[in-house]
UniProtKB/Swiss-Prot annotation:
GO terms, molecular function: hormone activity
GO biological process, one term: regulation of root development
Biased composition, class Basic residues, residue ranges: 41-62
Region (Disordered): 37-104
Signal peptide segment: 1-27
Entry protein name: Precursor of CEP11
Species annotation: Arabidopsis thaliana
UniProt KW keywords: Apoplast, Developmental protein, Hormone, Hydroxylation, Secreted, Signal
Tissue expression remark: Expressed in lateral root primordia and in lateral roots excluding the meristem region.
Assembly and oligomerization: Interacts with CEP receptors (e.g. CEPR1 and CEPR2).
Modification sites for Hydroxyproline: 92, 96
Family, similarity comment: Belongs to the C-terminally encoded plant signaling peptide (CEP) family.
Top-level division of the source organism's lineage: Eukaryota
Length: 104
């Protein structure tokens, strides 16, 4: 009995630790998001005034210092979100107009 209880406690502590680690990672990622957003905007407005969207996408092709890497991950993630939304709107009988726009 004592052994199983010990195993359960160990398991629980591991799970809790894991959860905390994940939470912290997500928290820092979100914190990074905002600072990354601002620095990205500042940086892109320095280089190119008009197209900072293009500049952001070319970012990871040129040079990717670790702090920039997070920015590219962020843009990729937002692209995924848009992709999901796009798929949602192309559901049969939903709105064919949007579907055509996305395909072209």
């Amino acid at each position: 009995m004592a052994k199983t209880r010990r195993v359960i406690y160990l398991f629980l502590t591991i799970v809790l630790l894991f959860c905390e680690l994940i939470d912290e990672a997500q928290g820092s990622r979100f914190r990074c998001h905002h600072s990354e957003d601002y620095s990205c905007k500042k940086r892109s407005s320095h280089h190119h005034h008009h197209h900072h969207h293009h500049q952001q996408q070319q970012h990871h092709h040129k040079d990717t210092p670790p702090e920039e890497l997070q920015g590219s991950i962020k843009t990729r993630r937002s692209k995924d979100i848009y992709g999901l939304n796009a798929f949602r709107s192309t559901e049969p009988g939903h709105s064919p107009g949007v579907g055509h726009l996305i395909k072209t």
